[in-house]
């Protein structure tokens, strides 16, 4: 017999809910969508253009989409330097953002002219990758070298093109700091990973105190 699940309160009264249709505005000081769909992993992406120009930028909409082969993706509103570079070269590197790298990551999202090196701007060290011609962030404990699988211009439900582009890339090489491998398992809660939590400035950090375990029912 399945175990009894805890009671949860019902909220079926419309008076208890804020309702809005995104196309008509949300009526709040800040769009709640980003805060609700979160916290989200940060897509700290390094790229290189066909002319050799290097770019490093964080993306709020980023995640993994497949296990085998491993595929990750980030969404960019055009015309961003990262999008231009991946369209030209078909390669990028994702760099894990940790609490100690938060300020440097934030610095790399400054609006600067194309060609300005965000590695230098944020005081970070670029190191060569093995399978792609894009530098990694040496200070980041995890790097994914990626080759572009597909770049999609997103559409709304009417089939109209938006100004957002989703770049999907296959992870072809992985670099992990060995101290974060505990008995062969990546120490997610010990890495100090930070997430985008929505709002104009909110972030969250993953730590051991927030962990709980739950196994799939049999």
PLM features: residue spans?
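Basic, polyanion-binding surface patches
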Residues: 1-218
